[in-house]
């Protein structure tokens, strides 16, 4: 389902500005305990597994559309605090990776 939404978004972006260079960034992985009551019980153990598969889904779509790709999970993890979001260091690492990727795209 997420893949369909990403495809629609890329189609719209390319229709709006066909010459734009696009960087598709897949999300970080959920923490192993995210589904527990003390974190976010709206998630399940299966949600953790799905989050780990999203990197491949996004990469396949990036290749299909000929856009650049970065896996956020390659540079940042979910925080211990909530098992769902990045901590400040993770945000900084992801920002640095995006900056580097955009610089590479511009050269």
Which role does the model predict for each range below?
Residues 1-107:
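Alpha-helical cap/lid subdomain in secreted, periplasmic
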């Amino acid at each position: 389902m997420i893949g369909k939404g990403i495809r629609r978004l890329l189609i719209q972006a390319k229709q709006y500005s066909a010459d734009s260079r696009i960087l598709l960034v897949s999300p970080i992985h959920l923490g192993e305990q995210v589904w527990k009551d003390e974190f976010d019980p709206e998630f399940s153990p299966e949600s953790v597994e799905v989050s780990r598969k999203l990197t491949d889904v996004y990469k396949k779509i990036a290749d299909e559309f000929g856009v650049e790709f970065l896996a956020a999970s390659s540079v940042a993890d979910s925080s211990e605090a909530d098992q769902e979001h990045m901590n400040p260091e993770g945000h900084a690492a992801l920002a640095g990776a995006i900056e580097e990727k955009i610089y590479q795209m511009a050269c």
